[in-house]
Amino acid sequence: MIGGLFLNTLSFVIVSNHSIVNNTANVHHIQQERVIVQQHQVVSAITQNYYPEFSIAVLFVSFLALYRSTNFKTCVGILMFKILSMTLLGPMLIAYGYYIDGIVTTTVLSLRFAYLAYFWYVNSRFEFILYNTTTLMFVHGRAAPFKRSSHSSIYVTLYGGINYMFVNDLTLHFVDPMLVSIAIRGLAHADLTVVRAVELLNGDFIYVFSQEPVVGVYNAAFSQAVLNEIDLKEEEGDRTYDVS
């Protein structure tokens, strides 16, 4: 197929219709009604046979328009492919006669781009289009996709160490974690601060950002024996010896 990704449903129906008409042009007048009925059935069958191809075209373009990734390089590659699809591939399909595929590809991608461009205009950040999302979190000027929880509450957890945390593919260093804040912009609008820094056994930290203060953290990952061992080590470390 030249210049196209999918089968053109309309072109196959038209070609099949013409071939059937040419083959039945010299049929006797008595059998004409029967031939017309057969012709209608064949064209309908051909149209139904190419419905899956048209559905695949729509699903693929919809998937491409909505697909998002957290990797920066992957997002750049997908964005470039979308731009080429809207400006080059779509018009090429229309020029070669694949009207359905070309119109669907260009229309769906253009509508998605226009929808995200609104958030780009309101917040003055191009990352809405780059990450293909309507909600972003900004950590000291660095943008990353924001993932909502299952019950739509707004909070963020970032993994890191004693003086750094990972924001998507970036590493943010800080002196005091209490000075780090997160701004949620887009469909959701919120400002989050660090409410809890959870230290793990390996020395790493999980930083919890929320609008509500954390009352406590329940530790359910350790058995009672491990907890007793940790308490004993802490007691030994707190002992002081008087040497005279």
Curated annotation (Swiss-Prot):
Matches recorded under Pfam families: Corona_NS3b
One GO cellular component term: membrane
Keyword line: Host membrane, Membrane, Transmembrane, Transmembrane helix
Lineage, uppermost ranks: Viruses, Riboviria, Orthornavirae, Pisuviricota, Pisoniviricetes
Residues in CoV 3a-like viroporin TM domain copies: 41-131
CoV 3a-like viroporin CD domain sequence ranges: 135-214
Membrane topology: Multi-pass membrane protein
Intracellular or extracellular location(s): Host membrane
Family: Belongs to the coronaviruses NS3b protein family.
Keyword Cell inner membrane: no
InterPro entries linked: a/bCoV_VIROPORIN_3A-like_CD, a/bCoV_VIROPORIN_3A-like_TM, Coronavirus_Orf3a/b
Name the record gives this protein: Non-structural protein 3b
Residues annotated as transmembrane: 46-66, 75-95, 102-122
